[in-house]
Amino acid sequence: MAEYRYDVVVIGAGPAGEGAAMNAAKHGKRVAVIEDKSQVGGNCTHMGTIPSKALRHAVKQIIQFNTNTMFRDIGEPRWFSFPRVLQNAERVIGKQVKIRTQFYARNRVDLYRGRASFIDENRIEVRGGLNGKEVLYGKQIVIATGSRPYLPEDVDFTHRRIYNSDSILKLSHTPRTLIIYGAGVIGCEYASIFVGLGVKVDLINPGERLLSFLDGEISDALSYHLRDNGVLVRHNEQYDSVVGDDHGVVLTMKSGKRIRADAFLWCNGRTGNTDNLGLENIGLEPNARGQLAVDNHYRTKIPHVFAAGDVIGWPSLASAAYDQGRSASSEIVKDDFFRFITDVPTGIYTIPEISSVGRTEAELTEAKVPYEVGQAFFKDLARAQITGDTVGMLKLLFHRETMELLGIHCFGDQASEIVHIGQAIMNQPGELNTIEYFVNTTFNYPTMAEAYRVAALNGLNRIF
């Protein structure tokens, strides 16, 4: 059996694996990446971020067409099937795979296809590839295997009407009614997508409120707009059984309620991809969710074995995963770019979308920080009035004494783009992080960025 030696071996070709591999290669290291799928990109490209956001964009265009009175002269509203809309996502996936495959080739990173399993702390067996079994020796190893939907054993996911957040992309028809169990980020995003296609959606939330990690006002705005669009949200409900038949799926909840729909989508939790990695051979034990523990340098308890991305849990975002992988690699090559990823912007691609960075009002109140609030409502902005995307707001939280920007929370069209303007100021050192920047800066007009000036003036007017 052939054995190949590398400075760095990365398991997984998703965002975290790509970040780790590219950074190590650019520092002159000999790098290998092991990927068990036929194409690079990981769950992000094939099952998660890219397809779901491409779906969302297509649905948003349909909604804009159907709600714009100008287009009524053309005819009646247009409706598209889920498979038809999915075709747009498939085109984007192909483009992403092509680009990312070129990254590996251009940086001379060796790609091995197959399933990875540790033999010992430095050697990894690759099985199922074109060359049968191969062994890679890595001086340093990065585990970046990602995650998959958590699937409870008492739900039959082999039933043709019961889906999880990965298999939903294989849906071959548009259901009239849909039950979504789990009201986290993925559940809320798919609720927006399906209700935009005219599907009647029941969103079952085991918790007390939607996306409780968000600022309360933003969470409330999401709840209102989902309901306003026709989503029925049920809080504090846990499933008792999920039973599918030839005509639909019946969800029975522990409260005694029973709901029937054409299809059922499970969106409640994810599990790290650590099974079958042979971790027992090196003394690593994942937690109950299959996630690995790391220190502030992304090291596991084995000094030369690192982990990054969804496989270590929070925040389980593609953007953070790439930076985590790059930072783990920075620790390996000892460059000057290492940072432990903490203050990550959140992008939630509901319709309208949500984005935030920094602290919430509840966190600042609990910490007894003297803060003030500045608000800008999209309905008052000329650019939003022009585009018709008037739903939403920008909310700035700042220290009322030092004027330091503490939190940015945005709900509405382009929220995930808008938030980065404020993030750039929040990341400035010392007195350069100030809300007064937005008052003393000239913004293009009309733009959505102007919301920062409006919100800053609104907040400063509250200071006395």
Curated annotation (Swiss-Prot):
Cofactor(s) the protein needs: FAD
UniProt xrefs under InterPro entries: Class-I_Pyr_Nuc-Dis_Oxidored (IPR050151), FAD/NAD-bd_sf (IPR036188), FAD/NAD-binding_dom (IPR023753), FAD/NAD-linked_Rdtase_dimer_sf (IPR016156), Pyr_nuc-diS_OxRdtase (IPR001100), Pyr_nucl-diS_OxRdtase_dimer (IPR004099), STH_gammaproteobact (IPR022962)
Gene Ontology biological-process entries: 2-oxoglutarate metabolic process; NADP metabolic process
Could you cite one Gene Ontology molecular function of this protein? NAD(P)+ transhydrogenase (Si-specific) activity
Give the catalytic activity: NAD(+) + NADPH = NADH + NADP(+)
Which interval of the chain is the signal sequence? Answer: none
| Entry's localization field | Cytoplasm
* Keywords for the protein's UniProt record, in alphabetical order: Cytoplasm, FAD, Flavoprotein, NAD, NADP, Oxidoreductase
GO cellular-component terms in the record?
cytosol
Pfam families attached here?
Pyr_redox_2 (PF07992), Pyr_redox_dim (PF02852)
Q: Where does FAD bind?
A: E35, D36, K37, S38, Q39, V40, G41, G42, N43, C44
Per the UniProt entry, the Enzyme Commission number(s) are 1.6.1.1
Q: How is the cofactor bound?
A: Binds 1 FAD per subunit.
Gene3D superfamilies hit by this protein: 3.30.390.30, FAD/NAD(P)-binding domain
Keyword set includes DNA-binding: no
The record's annotation in NCBIfam families points to: PRK05249.1 (NF003585)
Protein task = Conversion of NADPH, generated by peripheral catabolic pathways, to NADH, which can enter the respiratory chain for energy generation.
Q: Which family does it belong to?
A: Belongs to the class-I pyridine nucleotide-disulfide oxidoreductase family.
Q: What is this protein called?
A: Soluble pyridine nucleotide transhydrogenase
Organism of origin is: Hahella chejuensis (strain KCTC 2396)
